[in-house]
């Protein structure tokens, strides 16, 4: 092994004499690059406080070995402020001497403060992908309450069933479910205003469709009605009015339409029209139809002017198109019923229709 090492010249550099010289000077044989850089850097001259604290710090460290260096610095600062100018004067003069000496030793010295390493602040920002995914999930779900919820609460509570954004066509196609509409209509969007009965009748004209052609209903003054009711509100006092379903038909028959068409259309016309009228505020005093049944027919006919209702009773002399008043079909009775009963039922039905038509128009 020694013969191999002796054959190379690099073994001559393994002399320990320089290390011994460094150790004799009191310097560490192993120096890190940071320590070498600190020695080459020129230190600033000490001020008066540093000159005074150099010895005072050692004295406090001996008296209080358990105190941290920061606590010692606080104590030194309070003690320095407590000194009088006369006590500070020798330290101020010593600091001035050191400054002049520093200027002579380093004439080209310029103070360059060290750049402190800035700690990178971790910004707690929510990922944009998470926000987009939560937004898309919120658009497909309906929250339980109208209160705002954070993204974390939505993750814990999970999704919500139902469609959050139903189109307006769904609202128009399913208006009969009044209670369901309040639950399925999206939160955050303005609800459509309530329609008046007259506006509802005008809008119903464009949404009606029947299996028959347009000539199936030429005698309803051009007004068409939708079969399904648009309002769950019913006029309870109108339900007691007897509507005859036997005898002559209210609408003249058309050869293109089946017989079942007239009964369903006639029922939907009255039901839908009275349903819209039910949204209006009731008149001050409602007529009590229960009491009318108890009154004899003679008393009722005695209080009325029969000549006034001749145009309604004599239906054979009028054209069928004149049997409507503002889209409401007049009620008549079959010819096989007694004349007194026919007049009573017709008068009551026509008077009721005239009253509510005039009330809705006004």
Curated annotation (Swiss-Prot):
SUPFAM superfamilies: HMG-box. InterPro entries: HMG_box_dom, HMG_box_dom_sf, Sox7/17/18_central, Sox_C, SRY-related_HMG-box_TF-like. Gene3D superfamilies: High mobility group box domain. Residues 245-362 form the Sox C-terminal domain. It comes from Xenopus tropicalis. This is Transcription factor Sox-7. Residues 21-41 are annotated as: Disordered. Expressed in the embryonic pronephric sinus as well as posterior cardinal veins.
């Amino acid at each position: 092994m020694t013969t191999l090492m002796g054959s190379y010249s690099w073994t001559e550099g393994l002399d320990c004499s320089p290390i011994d010289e460094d150790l004799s000077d009191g310097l560490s044989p192993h120096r890190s690059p940071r320590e070498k850089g600190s020695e080459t850097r020129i230190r600033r001259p000490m001020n008066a406080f540093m000159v005074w604290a150099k010895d005072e710090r050692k004295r406090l460290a001996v008296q209080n070995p358990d105190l941290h260096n920061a606590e010692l610095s606080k104590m030194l600062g309070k003690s320095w402020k407590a000194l009088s100018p006369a006590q500070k004067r020798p330290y101020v003069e010593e600091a001035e001497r050191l400054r002049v000496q520093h200027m002579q030793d380093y004439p080209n010295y310029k103070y360059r403060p060290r750049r402190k390493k800035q700690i990178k602040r971790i910004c707690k920002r929510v990922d944009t992908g998470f926000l987009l995914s939560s937004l898309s999930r919120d658009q497909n779900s309906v929250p339980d309450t109208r209160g705002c919820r954070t993204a974390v609460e939505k993750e814990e509570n999970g999704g919500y069933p139902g469609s959050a954004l139903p189109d307006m066509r769904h609202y128009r196609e399913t208006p009969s479910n009044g209670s369901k509409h309040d639950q399925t209509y999206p939160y955050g969007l303005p609800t459509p205003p309530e329609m008046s009965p007259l506006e509802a009748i005008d809008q119903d004209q464009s949404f009606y469709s029947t299996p028959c052609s347009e000539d199936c209903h030429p005698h309803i003054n051009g007004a068409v009605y939708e079969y399904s009711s648009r309002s769950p509100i019913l006029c309870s006092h109108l339900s007691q009015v007897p509507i005859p379903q036997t005898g002559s038909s209210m609408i003249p028959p058309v050869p293109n339409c089946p017989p079942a068409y007239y009964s369903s259309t006639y029922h939907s016309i009255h039901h839908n029209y009275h349903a819209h009228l039910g949204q209006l505020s009731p008149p001050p005093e409602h007529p009590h139809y229960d009491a009318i049944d108890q009154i004899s027919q003679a008393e009722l006919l005695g209080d009325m002017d029969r000549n006034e209702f001749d145009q309604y009773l004599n239906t054979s002399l009028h054209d069928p198109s004149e049997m409507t008043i503002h889209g409401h079909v007049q009620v008549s009775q079959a010819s096989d019923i007694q004349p007194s009963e026919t007049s009573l039922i017709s008068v009551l039905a026509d008077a009721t229709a005239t009253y509510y038509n005039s009330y809705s128009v006004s």
